[in-house]
């Protein structure tokens, strides 16, 4: 399995397909495979790089240096190891925060940035939400937490129409292994993320996307991102926080249209 050392931590990644490179950055769970159908959709026309964040998946399981800035450095090392830069980065939620730091601190590695369902910085709502999610994990365990999180992460209409897909997601998450030190460090990492003041320095062509019924990172967070990033495009689609699973073709098509305009 391919991996690269980043500040003494092994970062695993997978590469699939051929064409202009797309780096997919997962959300809080950190496991690249969580992108589900998006991997094959992008691999149809692109070289897709899908890393596991430090502390997750096949990367080294450590809570050391758990920050968004460190994750951006890790992803810059992955791009260098594959030798494919500059890339089109697509990041969802926590991955979107990492994409912001790549565009701020490693802009030479990017052709474009797509930030999905993310935040520039936490506010009282976001902190309260993750304080609750942290307590759920600590007090009730992984399955109860996954059952509750589904209410934040999926569009209610999608849950109404596709309850079996939501339950399959809950079962997959619940089958994982929860390592408290790493899990809580990752929650602290996204709640502590704050790129607000640095966003105006971004020169990378940027698309900001969000689901209209995202209850984890409501659309006002994405509107703030788009307002702060010079020239950013802002699109609201029908869906929830996990819109890449709910509306895979719609999300993929929207991002592909943007990427096609920024291939050079």
Residue ranges and their predicted role:
Residues 7-61:
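Conserved HGGG/HGGXW glycine-rich cap/lid loop of the alpha/beta-hydrolase fold
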Residues 49-90:
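Active-site loop/oxyanion-hole signature of alpha/beta-hydrolase fold enzymes
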Residues 100, 104, 111-140:
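Flexible "cap/lid" loop of the alpha/beta hydrolase fold
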Residues 124-126, 144-198:
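Conserved alpha/beta-hydrolase catalytic His-Asp/Glu region
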Residues 202, 208-210:
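Short beta-strand/loop motif that positions the catalytic acidic residue
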Residues 213-217:
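Acidic catalytic loop of the alpha/beta-hydrolase fold
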Residues 223-242:
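Catalytic histidine neighborhood in serine/cysteine hydrolases
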Residues 240-252:
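Catalytic histidine-centered segment of alpha/beta-hydrolase-like enzymes
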């Amino acid at each position: 399995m391919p991996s690269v050392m980043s500040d003494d931590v092994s970062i695993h990644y997978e590469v699939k397909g051929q064409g202009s490179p797309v780096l997919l950055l997962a959300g809080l769970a950190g496991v690249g495979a969580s992108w589900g159908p998006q991997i094959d959709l992008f691999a149809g026309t692109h070289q897709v790089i899908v890393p596991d964040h430090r502390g997750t998946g096949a990367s080294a399981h450590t809570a050391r240096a758990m920050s968004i800035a460190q994750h951006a450095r890790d992803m810059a090392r992955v791009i260098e190891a594959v030798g494919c830069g500059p890339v089109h980065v697509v990041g969802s939620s926590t991955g979107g925060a990492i994409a912001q730091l790549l565009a701020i601190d490693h802009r030479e590695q990017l052709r474009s940035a797509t930030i999905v369902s993310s935040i520039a910085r936490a506010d009282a709502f976001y902190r309260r939400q993750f304080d609750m999610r942290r307590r759920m994990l600590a007090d009730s365990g992984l399955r109860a937490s996954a059952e509750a999180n589904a209410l934040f992460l999926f569009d209610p209409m999608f849950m109404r129409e596709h309850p079996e897909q939501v339950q399959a997601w809950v079962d997959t998450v619940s089958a994982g292994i929860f390592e408290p030190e790493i899990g809580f460090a990752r929650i602290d990492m996204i709640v502590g993320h704050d790129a607000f003041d640095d966003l105006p320095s971004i020169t990378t062509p940027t698309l900001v996307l969000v689901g209209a019924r995202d209850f984890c990172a409501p659309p006002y967070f994405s509107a703030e991102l788009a307002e702060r990033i010079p020239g950013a495009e802002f699109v609201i689609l029908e869906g929830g926080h996990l819109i890449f699973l709910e509306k895979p073709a719609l999300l993929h098509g929207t991002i592909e249209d943007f990427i096609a305009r920024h291939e050079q």
